[in-house]
């Protein structure tokens, strides 16, 4: 036969996959390869960043139920990276450090609007109630910490305890009254330079002894030795970024948590750059 002479083999009932099935299998194979490649890159990145292991070692070393061996400032500065998504950092810190509770008397600039009775009612709200509440492009942020084991009476706290507000619209934070106890300082004025403390210019740059400008000014020093509550606001393309930093005496300031004045999520890592920052 002609078929035998040409060496052509006839195969009966052979399955031929449809073209769309072949394309589908190729897509699945490429997806698996991409996942494997991304996993390898992530493993390599973890090896190249030893601070990830340091954070884990710190979590294992400093148990949450043994906070008495460190000062309050040390607990906040050495706080591990929050592993929660869409979780405000003050809430995460309050969960780890039960003896410390964030609280803000006057949080957002929008809370200064309305009738006096309404402002007083808003001022009585706690920071936990305001953290998830946004008004415009501003989000509530606590301005200081206090020891929950010895809280002050409400009557004493309500009078003369308004530390300030941070407005997302005009990027201004006010501190009209600051306690005079201890090493407390008067807070900042607006960006126009009114009320700026000594050593800072109208833009809010604070020049240290070595001449290096640093953004932010000390807002208030609480009764806890070595603890400073530091308010930074860095102008970005998306609005203002408000950071509360906790530092110990003689130690460079480190961010304890972030409070964003944008619509982005709160960063999960300590000191991570925000979008546009």
Curated annotation (Swiss-Prot):
GO cellular component: plasma membrane
Annotated TM spans: none
Keyword ATP-binding: no
Consequence of gene disruption: The Rv2743c-Rv2742c double mutation reduces intracellular ATP levels under surface-stress conditions to less than 60% of wild-type levels.
Region (Disordered): 31-70, 113-133, 180-210
Compositional bias per record (Basic residues), positions renumbered to this chain: 116-133
Skewed-composition ranges (Basic and acidic residues): 31-54
InterPro entries attached to this UniProt entry: DUF3046 (IPR021408)
Name this polypeptide is given: Putative envelope-preserving system protein Rv2742c
């Amino acid at each position: 036969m002609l078929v035998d002479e040409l060496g052509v083999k006839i195969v009966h009932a052979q399955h031929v996959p449809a073209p769309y099935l072949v394309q589908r299998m190729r897509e699945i194979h490429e997806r698996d390869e991409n996942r494997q490649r991304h996993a390898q890159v992530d493993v390599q990145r973890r090896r190249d960043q030893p601070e990830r292991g340091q954070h884990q070692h710190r979590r294992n070393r400093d148990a949450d139920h043994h906070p008495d061996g460190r000062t309050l400032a040390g607990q906040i500065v050495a706080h591990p990276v929050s592993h929660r998504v869409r979780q405000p950092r003050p809430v995460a810190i309050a969960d780890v450090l039960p003896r410390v509770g964030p609280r803000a008397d006057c949080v957002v600039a929008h809370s200064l609007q309305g009738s006096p009775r309404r402002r007083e009612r808003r001022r009585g709200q706690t920071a936990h109630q305001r953290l998830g509440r946004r008004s415009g492009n501003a989000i509530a942020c606590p301005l200081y910490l206090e020891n929950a084991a010895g809280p002050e009476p409400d009557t004493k706290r309500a009078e003369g305890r308004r530390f300030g507000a941070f407005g997302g619209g005009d990027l201004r934070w006010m501190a009209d009254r600051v306690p005079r106890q201890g090493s407390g300082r008067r807070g900042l004025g607006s960006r126009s330079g009114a009320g700026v403390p000594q050593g800072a210019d109208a833009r809010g740059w604070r020049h240290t002894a070595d001449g290096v400008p640093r953004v932010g000014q000390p807002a208030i020093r609480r009764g806890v030795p070595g603890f400073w509550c530091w308010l930074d606001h860095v102008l970005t393309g998306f609005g203002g970024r408000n950071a509360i930093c906790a530092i110990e005496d003689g130690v460079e300031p480190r961010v304890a948590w972030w409070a964003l004045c944008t619509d982005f999520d709160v960063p999960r890592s300590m000191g991570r750059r925000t979008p546009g920052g």
